[in-house]
Amino acid sequence: MFRKAWMLLNYKQKKNIIFIFALMFVAMILESLSIGIILPLISILLKGEIDTSFFSYFFVFGTLTGKNLVYIGLSVTLIIFLIKSLSLVFNLWQQTKFLRNLQFELTNRLFEYYLKSDYIFFLQNNSAHLYRNLTDLTSTFVSYIKASMVFLGEIIVFIGIAFVLFYVDFLGTTIILFSVGIVSFLIYVLTIEKISLLGEQRNIVGGELNKHLLQGMASAKDVKILDREADLIHQVDKNLFKHTRLIQIIQFITGLPRFSFEILMVCTFSALIFVMIDAKKEMIDIIQYLGIFAVASFRIVPGASRILNSFQNIKYIEPSVKLLIQEFDLKDNSYMKKNYLPKDSSIPIKFQKEINLKNLSFSYPIRKEFSLSKISMTIKKGDFIGIIGETGSGKSTLINLLIGLLKPSEGKVEV
């Protein structure tokens, strides 16, 4: 699905996404450093020195001791966190700018695609569904791209932090990551089918809701004449209730991982403390290791929750993305290659003498029988004519053929 969604993006948009992922990689390095600096900082505060470890190669302060070592350690920590925050702010700005431009360009392209389609396209498609595609589907596609970026970005950061924690304590990190993996897998298995089903239902209910809302606004005169207000209000209420109910359920499901991971972290920390005490480790060492794991958990818990939430959102949004891809007709891909439909370069026709209809026939694509069959007639300039017939006999179709909105299936119109 992501490969097909990728095809909807133009070259510039793809370059922007690659640039954003490069920023995410930089963020991963800075996140890892911000976690890694905690261990030597705790060591300085508790012991007045940096333990001989991997981190000591990066933080060599010579013979500094006491307050000077504390000041230097705090300063380095502050600088790393400041650089990390500025980097994340810049990354956030780039992401929001890209998503805004994507929303604008995609909606504009789809609207132009619709507007430059043949008139018969509008006869074959419900205007409420087209309106839904222009407003709802384009915004959900942007949400799909955003969720994909969050999913991959958080995984990159998660891997970076995991490497740091593995160096600090391989066993403790393994226990934590294994526990997070098990809980994530269980939540995924229990919710994935439900989320996909909710996404499909959302498209159906959203289309019906838009249809009835547009009917009420665009056909208010007919609704009042036919005394259909109560029926239309009932239909809107029914679909609106279903729509808001679907939103409530998906928000509830996507909110569950955060609480699950919080409980998991408390249980895991308690288990680690018992293991360390049982191993007769010094209390200072226990505090030191728990300190870095505690700081890391402030990033791991929301990160794991965002990874799972973004994946759930991706599955929820996928049915809408499939509809949008169908709208752009990626099978033939002619529009996507050109980005814009060619302008009509035909020479304007001047009506000077008469219009001749020769064996004119027309059938709609969804029907086998002809709406008009073998029509031949001549209309001279200046003549006033009237076209009469029963409902459905083809009067409007003939007018649409005369003014060029429809193209004949057989025969021709000569001017």
Regions found by a protein language model. Name each.
Residues 403:
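Helix-to-loop junction immediately C-terminal to a conserved catalytic motif
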Residues 328-386, 414:
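Primarily ABC-family ATPase nucleotide-binding module
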Residues 77-84, 181-182, 258-261, 265, ...:
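Hydrophobic alpha-helical segments in the permease module
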Residues 21-83, 166-178, 277-287:
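Transmembrane helix-loop-helix hairpins at lipid-water interfaces of multipass membrane proteins
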Residues 23-26, 150-201, 271-286:
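Transmembrane helices of ABC transporter permease
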Residues 49, 100, 108-138, 212-235, ...:
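Short intracellular "coupling" helices and adjacent cytoplasmic loop segments at the cytosolic face
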Residues 205, 221-228, 252-255, 259, ...:
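Cytosolic ends of transmembrane helices, especially the final helix of ABC transmembrane type-1 domains
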Residues 95, 115-160, 218, 242-244, ...:
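Juxtamembrane loop-to-helix connectors within ABC transporter transmembrane domains
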